[in-house]
Amino acid sequence: MALERLFRRKRPSGGNRDVPELWTKCEACGAQIYKKEFQENLHVCPKCGHHHRLPARERVAMLADPGTFQEITRLRPLDPLGFVDTKPYVERLKAYQAETGRPDAILGGTCQIGGVPAVLLVMDYAFAGGSMGSVVGEEIARGAERAAEEGRALVIVAASGGARMQEAALSLMQMAKTVMSLDRVWARRLPYVSVLTDPTTGGVTASFAALADVIFAEPGALIGFAGPRVIRQTIRQELPEGFQRSEFLLKHGMVDRVTDRRRLKEELVRVLRHLHPGVAYAPGV
């Protein structure tokens, strides 16, 4: 018995420890990926190339030139309707804010992208599915106005399930507001570039996201108004293979280019330098 006790495995004491996960699993192919490699690869699977969702902060770090990003999105949402479903809207907002560290579903600021002055706005899908409510709409409108006033390009990275139902008509109103704000950018002949990521749906697709001078999309991104399941149930027909995915939209002229995330900044810089009136275009850059 003494010998058995000697070799018996002892359980570690101290309860649950905060040990970081070292591996992550690809949602598409199931490959086990070393988390550090996954992050360095911008959340793209090195095995199959599947593009996982990228946090807003990491998206900004990927696109903005180092040390140039100055945040301008600081508005906080209210609950003018006193909306309650299974729980009060204000409680949902507090939970999302605690989870993401963001006041709402958008992160934006002034920066340079490849030396081109820009206003960069990135939607955060982790906050209420990136839904567009009063704050998101107002921040986009203010960002567009800032770009026009300061002669900056406007770049918006979309990731959204659409309008925020808890704000009802106030949310739908943001579609018109964001579209109207783009007029100031175009009046100054400044470039507006949209990047559609997975997913971009609903009122976001039906408003500012689809109106850019140049529209990039990430590989495999779901892009559309209603989701495929809703459409299938409505028309009672099977949908074409790849329907509403970025490659399908490229084939049918709805986006200009499907670009791997790891090459996105390079291609974005090329477009901005070509279109921005205050930047001399250098062929081959």
Swiss-Prot record:
What remark does the entry make about the cofactor?
Binds 1 zinc ion per subunit.
Q: Which domain of life is it from?
A: Bacteria
What SUPFAM superfamilies does the annotation carry?
ClpP/crotonase
State the species of origin.
Thermus thermophilus (strain ATCC 27634 / DSM 579 / HB8)
Subunit details:
Acetyl-CoA carboxylase is a heterohexamer composed of biotin carboxyl carrier protein (AccB), biotin carboxylase (AccC) and two subunits each of ACCase subunit alpha (AccA) and ACCase subunit beta (AccD).
- Where does the record place the CoA carboxyltransferase N-terminal domain? 22-285
Q: Which cofactor does it need?
A: Zn(2+)
Concerning its family, UniProt says:
Belongs to the AccD/PCCB family.
What is this protein identified as? Acetyl-coenzyme A carboxylase carboxyl transferase subunit beta
UniProt zinc finger (C4-type) residues: 26-48
Q: Name one GO biological process term.
A: fatty acid biosynthetic process
Q: What is its EC number?
A: 2.1.3.15
Question: What start-end ranges are recorded for coiled-coil regions in this protein?
Answer: none
Keyword list (alphabetical) reads: ATP-binding, Cytoplasm, Fatty acid biosynthesis, Fatty acid metabolism, Lipid biosynthesis, Lipid metabolism, Metal-binding, Nucleotide-binding, Transferase, Zinc, Zinc-finger
Q: Which Pfam families match?
A: Carboxyl_trans, Zn_ribbon_ACC
The record's subcellular locations are: Cytoplasm
Disulphide bond pairs:
none
Question: What EC class is this?
Answer: transferase
Q: Which reaction does it catalyse?
A: N(6)-carboxybiotinyl-L-lysyl-[protein] + acetyl-CoA = N(6)-biotinyl-L-lysyl-[protein] + malonyl-CoA
For this UniProt entry, the molecular function terms from Gene Ontology, in alphabetical order, are: acetyl-CoA carboxylase activity; ATP binding; carboxyl- or carbamoyltransferase activity; zinc ion binding
Q: In which pathway does it act?
A: Lipid metabolism; malonyl-CoA biosynthesis; malonyl-CoA from acetyl-CoA: step 1/1
Role according to the record: Component of the acetyl coenzyme A carboxylase (ACC) complex. Biotin carboxylase (BC) catalyzes the carboxylation of biotin on its carrier protein (BCCP) and then the CO(2) group is transferred by the transcarboxylase to acetyl-CoA to form malonyl-CoA.
Listed binding positions for Zn(2+) are: 26, 29, 45, 48
Q: Is Disulfide bond there in the keyword field? A: no
State the GO CC annotations.
Answer: acetyl-CoA carboxylase complex
